[in-house]
Swiss-Prot record:
Residues 355-418 are annotated as: Disordered. This is Ran GTPase-activating protein. Pfam families: LRR_6. Both full-length and truncated protein are expressed in testis (at protein level). Expressed in oocytes and nurse cells (at protein level). It comes from Drosophila melanogaster (Fruit fly). Forms a complex with Nup358/RanBP2, sbr/Nxf1 and Nxt1. Associates with the nuclear pore complex via its interaction with Nup358/RanBP2. Residues 387-410 have a biased composition (Acidic residues).
Length: 596
């Protein structure tokens, strides 16, 4: 009695005691195989946890361990990761049923259930359903099911079990306080994610939700975003490597004001792109001051989107990590972002642009390659009006190479493209038409188009034409006639000719209704082609620079009426079928900025 001490008792009570066979790499098939585990359970008075991670458990062995667990009502942590390697699909649910039934008999009160890295699937979930609905889980705080291959069906089964658990716990007077759900790499897809969202919205108690790499698209993202609004205590939210796109980012951004305690948000590799960055930036600028970690890496965000995000960090005094690596900033854009971040007291939070360094090395290689290509191209230009066989052969060789490279994925417009129609470009176009047309259109480059304008002359002129020239296009279907010229070219030639034919019509848009209608149709055709060839960012930036809405690294003079071209673009944006929301919103943002 003299050694009786409340403090020591409290300390002892606070110390977890348990049994671990972690990473023993043992194969347990029979009761005899697990005798050491059973003996430990029988001998140890207090067992708060049992760690079986890294072994493989059969049905009979699970039944024997279950007999030992029945003796421990104080049991609270089932650390059962990676324990069914090499097992038959029929063994897993049976083994889980034995373990779960034992905990129910013992009257255990689980706080942690970790079954990560087990190939459960819907079949394995059948072995968990009874346990998850039982009083054993009324006290559950952490449910860890990473890399369990649940699929949509397994996700649906889990959701229903959690909703039933919530109802059962409330009815028994023990409200469920599940705080953590780790469900990455489960192939939930939209159907499974939507079902899980129903559970999240029902429970309303989550502080951490991790759903990395689950093949979730916009339908699932919308449902999840709505469910997050009902979990105001969320501190960690991780949906890396799902396909949010800008639409999904908008939905998540709408949920952020409902999450004032958020400390970590991770949406890397989610294809949110620049428009998605705008959505996040706008929301973050207004709140979420407690954020410490933000991961938006590898999202194809351009430097404008990166700057918007950095500007939203001004009210984040606790920021420790801001990961924007792997986006499409370019060297100059990266420098601007680093410069803007350096003005903040949390400047050290910005992670290095390691991926950008790799891209810079590739850019240097490509630049060297382009220099070599340019030298070869100059030889062609020297023979632009030469009709000799030698000149024709050289020209054809270069054109073949150009076509091969024309549709390659484009990465950094601001640094790698000249934003003007150069003589080299027009020479190339004219070499693809007849020699007589080529010489005629060269003459057009420095004077007004001839009295009667043809579709060829209209499209291939280096300068915009007059209203008189436009009116002299006397064919019934001007759009079809112009497109027939554009469609004779491929790759970048097709793209650039389409852009500048559009601008030629837009140039006259406020003086001619017919020109305006053509410009609207051609703007749409331009971005339909950009989407089809996966060049949205490239073409968007190119047109923005031609309209003086985006700074251009290379100074150039334009003969086009920018005001008229912008007017036609605004009319095109009103069309419900124009491009997509990302392109529409980007144009609207820049146009509004130009007006302010």
């Amino acid at each position: 009695m003299s050694t009786f001490n409340f403090a020591s008792m409290a300390a002892q009570l606070g110390q977890e005691q348990g049994i671990s066979f972690e990473n023993k790499v043992l194969s347990w098939n029979t009761a005899a195989d697990v005798q050491d585990v059973v003996d430990a359970l029988n001998k140890q008075t207090t067992v708060h946890y049992l760690n079986l991670d890294g072994n493989t458990l059969g049905v009979e062995a699970a039944k024997a361990i279950g007999e030992g667990l029945k003796r421990h009502p104080e049991f609270r942590k089932a650390l059962w990761k990676n324990m069914f390697t090499g097992r038959l699909i029929s063994e897993i649910p049976e083994a889980l049923k034995h373990l779960g039934a034992a905990l129910i008999v013992a009257g255990a009160k689980l706080t942690v259930l970790d079954l990560s890295d087990n190939a459960l699937g819907p079949n394995g979930m059948r072995g968990l359903e009874e346990l998850l609905r039982s009083p054993v889980c009324y006290s559950l705080q952490e449910l860890l099911l990473c890399n369990c291959g649940l699929g949509p069906e397994g996700g649906s089964m889990l959701s229903r079990a959690l909703i039933d658990l919530h109802a059962n716990a409330n009815k028994a007077g023990f409200p469920l306080q599940l705080r953590v759900f780790i469900g990455s790499r489960n192939r939930l897809e939209d159907a499974g994610a939507t079902e899980m969202a129903t559970a999240f919205q029902t429970l309303k108690t989550f502080e951490e939700i991790v759903l990395e790499q689950n093949s979730i698209y916009i339908e699932g993202v919308e449902a999840l975003a709505e469910s997050f609004k009902h979990n105001p205590h969320l501190r960690v939210l991780n949906m890396n490597d799902n396909t949010l796109k800008s639409e999904g980012a908008e939905k998540i951004a709408e949920a952020l004001p409902f999450l004032p305690l958020l400390r970590e948000m991770s949406f890397g590799d989610c294809l949110i792109k620049t428009n998605g960055a705008y959505h996040f930036g706008e929301a973050l600028e207004r709140g979420n001051e407690r954020l410490e970690v933000i991961d938006l890496g590898f999202n194809e965000i351009n430097s404008d989107g990166g700057l918007v995000l950095v500007n939203a960090m001004g009210n984040k005094p606790k920021l420790r990590i801001l990961n924007l690596d792997g986006n499409s900033f370019g060297e100059e854009g990266s420098e601007k972002i680093i410069s803007e971040m350096s003005k903040l007291p949390t400047a050290a939070a910005l992670q290095p642009f390691q991926h950008q360094e790799e891209e810079d090395l590739e850019d240097e290689y490509q630049a060297d390659k382009q220099d070599a290509d340019y030298e070869e191209e100059e030889e062609v230009h020297e023979h632009a009006n030469d009709t000799t066989e030698e000149a024709d052969e050289d020209s054809e060789g270069d054109e073949d190479d150009e076509e091969d490279e024309g549709d390659e994925e484009y990465s950094n417009v601001a640094e790698e493209t000249a934003y003007v129609t150069t003589n080299a470009y027009t020479t190339k176009l004219f070499n693809d038409t007849t020699n007589s047309m080529a010489s005629e259109t060269f003459a057009v480059a420095n004077k007004t188009i001839s009295q009667k304008c043809t579709p060829e002359k209209f499209c291939l002129s280096q300068k915009p034409c007059s209203q008189e020239d436009f009116d002299s296009l006397d064919m019934d279907n001007k759009l079809e006639a112009l497109q027939s010229i554009v469609n004779q070219f491929t790759g970048d030639n097709h793209l650039l000719l389409l852009v500048f034919t559009t601008l030629k019509c837009a140039h006259l848009s406020q003086s001619s209704k017919a020109a305006l209608d053509l410009a609207v149709s051609l703007y749409q055709a331009t971005f339909d082609y950009a989407i089809k060839t996966k060049q949205e960012t490239r073409v968007l930036n190119y047109v923005l620079m031609q309209l003086r809405l985006l700074p251009c690294k290379e100074v150039f003079h334009s003969d086009y009426d920018v005001k008229n071209c912008r007017f036609a673009l605004r009319e095109a944006l009103k069309q419900p079928t124009f491009a997509n929301d990302n392109i529409k919103n980007s144009f609207k943002t820049f146009l509004e900025g130009a007006e302010s």
